Amino acid sequence: NREAQEYWVAKSFLLLADAYARKGNTFQAKSTLKSVIDNYDKNDDIVPAAKERLQKLK
């Protein structure tokens, strides 16, 4: 199902942002999280999680 696929793709971007942050590449981590926030339009836990991670990077 397409919605499930979109969810897991977005979830993978959150994990990718975590990996960037752990490697010290905060610019790429922030860019990845902002992209998720700007482009993911479902009402579930993805955008709040992205916002929380972004706040921790600032």
Model regions: which residues?
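Acidic, polar-rich low-complexity tracts and alpha-helical solenoid repeat scaffolds
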Residues: 1-58
